[in-house]
UniProtKB/Swiss-Prot annotation:
Catalytic activity: L-glutamine + H2O = L-glutamate + NH4(+)
Record Gene3D superfamilies: DD-peptidase/beta-lactamase superfamily
UniProt-listed InterPro entries: Beta-lactam/transpept-like, Glutaminase
Source organism per UniProt: Yersinia pestis
Enzyme class, first EC level, given as a word: hydrolase
Keywords: Hydrolase
Protein's name in the database: Glutaminase 1
NCBIfam families: Gln_ase (TIGR03814), PRK00971.1-1 (NF002132), PRK00971.1-2 (NF002133)
One GO molecular-function entry: glutaminase activity
Keyword Hydrolase belongs to the record: yes
Single Gene Ontology BP annotation: glutamate biosynthetic process
EC numbers, comma separated: 3.5.1.2
Amino acids binding substrate: S66, N117, E161, N168, Y192, Y244, V262
Subunit structure: Homotetramer.
Length: 308
């Protein structure tokens, strides 16, 4: 029996997964993230016409981290030809940790996909080349999508990440040695870490990313960020590469394109219907929200939704 989407359903799902809190681990390699209370839990759904359903801590903002990689790729697709992007970044799953250097060396500086650190750094490098103020431009895009000018970066998180950026800097310099990085490394790292340090709530994330369920168009339908084909391509990349080394498990359990961040957020797309955003800071072994993934799995089951 397929269940109707409403706030009561979302509340019920959160109660089902709340016992999982305590079984994961909050990201601690970024000190500012380690301070987030582990018991936070929220979910929100935004339909194509802008209707919002929500439960739990869905209005509380948190660091979106790698979810921002979808936004930076979207922005790059509006500024570059697809050929220009995909000759510098691949479309394949990595099978390696998100910040691994080994594969990059073997494959001569071309990252496997835009949703690992390596690929996202190349995308940020491309944005740095085309935009006079890439940090401000991404903020403007998000504020316009969400219709909220108070969305901002957390300077403390950005600074904390920059202070622990040796590995990402090494990645960028290695790509530079292969001719796949054009701008000053530290400047691009500042942009990249600010993107990761954007703060949004589940409600805001669901509103923001509904364009991926709406063939590249914003909620009103009046503005196309990307083409319908590009929206499908981003969704395809999220299925194969959006959940670090847990993409196969997520596709198996949830059956939706998804992108996670180590802040505990996940977005998931049901094409032509809605976008879901969940948040629970404790992560599983792959770096994905443990309770958040379980909540999406239950929602998919109870509503009978899957792209497969």
């Amino acid at each position: 029996m397929v269940t109707t989407l409403d706030n009561a359903l979302l509340n019920d799902i959160l109660q089902q997964v709340r016992p999982l809190i305590g079984q994961g681990k909050v990201a601690d390699y970024i000190p500012a993230l380690a301070e987030v209370p582990a018991n936070k839990l929220g979910i929100a759904v935004c339909t194509l016409d802008g209707q919002i359903f929500q439960a739990g801590d869905a209005d509380e903002r948190f660091s979106i981290q790698s979810i921002s990689k979808v936004l930076s790729l979207t922005l790059a697709l509006s500024r570059y030809s697809e050929q220009d992007i995909w000759q510098r970044v691949g479309k394949e799953p990595s099978g390696q940790p998100f910040n691994s250097l080994v594969q990059l060396e073997l494959e001569k500086g071309k990252p496997r996909n835009p949703f690992i650190n390596l690929g996202a750094l190349v995308v940020c490098d491309m944005l740095q080349s085309r935009l006079s103020a890439p940090k401000q431009r991404l903020l403007e895009v998000v504020r316009q999508l969400v219709k909220d000018d108070s969305i901002s970066y957390d300077p403390r998180v950005a600074r904390s990440e920059f202070e622990h950026s040796d590995r990402n800097a090494a990645i960028a310099y290695l790509m530079k040695s292969f001719g796949n990085f054009d701008n000053d490394v530290l400047t691009v790292l500042q942009t990249y870490f600010h993107y990761c340090a954007m703060r949004m709530s589940c409600v805001e994330l669901a509103r923001c990313f509904v364009y991926l369920a709406n063939q590249g168009r914003s909620i009103s339908g009046s503005e196309s960020l990307i083409t319908p084909m590009q929206a499908r391509q981003i969704n395809a990349l999220m299925i194969t590469s959006g959940m670090y080394d847990g993409a196969g498990e997520f596709a198996f359990r949830v059956g939706m394109p998804g992108k996670s961040g180590v802040g505990g957020g996940i977005i998931a797309i049901v094409p032509d219907e809605f976008c879901i955003a969940v948040w629970s800071p404790e992560l599983d072994h792959a770096g994905n929200s443990l309770a958040g993934t379980a909540a999406l799995e239950r929602l998919a089951q109870q509503m009978g939704r899957s792209i497969f």
